[in-house]
């Protein structure tokens, strides 16, 4: 299976999903089976609420598995990676960098914050998630301990 890394997705002015990676720039098509399979696996494992919603939306396509996977991946891309910018949507380590996509249904869509900017599946406790958030914000161990009223030792 293809590894997802250093990929930029964006929506063209014509409304097509475009891909920029080591192969160059091209339109995302159903024939991109390896990319679709890799993206689909990440969605299924790491974003189960988004996966469930996408499965419900494209339920009628399930009989044609490759097309079902493509439709789910295509929608996930459109809802999360719309801008062409200098920050890869999938970085060198395979981490997603979600973007705020210009969507006329923001706040009204029943899939808002489910498919777009989905919650990452983790077995971390709320306290552990808070530690990760503070670490991502650049806090040092001592500062995190201070904020959370904990001893470093």
Regions found by a protein language model. Give the residues of each.
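DNA-contacting interfaces and partner/effector-binding or oligomerization modules
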Residues: 1-114
């Amino acid at each position: 299976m293809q590894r997802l890394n250093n990929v930029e997705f964006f929506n063209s002015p014509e409304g097509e999903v475009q891909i920029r990676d080591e192969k160059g720039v091209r339109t995302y098509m159903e024939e991109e089976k390896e990319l679709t399979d890799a993206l689909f696996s990440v969605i299924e494992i790491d974003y189960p609420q988004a996966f469930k919603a996408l499965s419900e939306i494209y339920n009628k396509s399930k009989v044609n598995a490759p097309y079902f996977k493509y439709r789910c991946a295509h929608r996930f891309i459109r809802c999360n990676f719309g801008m062409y910018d200098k920050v890869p949507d999938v970085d060198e380590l395979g981490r997603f960098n979600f973007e705020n996509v210009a969507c006329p249904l923001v706040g009204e869509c029943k899939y808002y914050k489910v498919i777009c900017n989905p919650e990452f599946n983790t077995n971390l406790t709320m306290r552990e998630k808070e530690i990760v958030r503070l670490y991502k914000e650049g806090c040092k161990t001592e500062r995190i301990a201070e904020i959370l009223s904990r001893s470093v030792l």
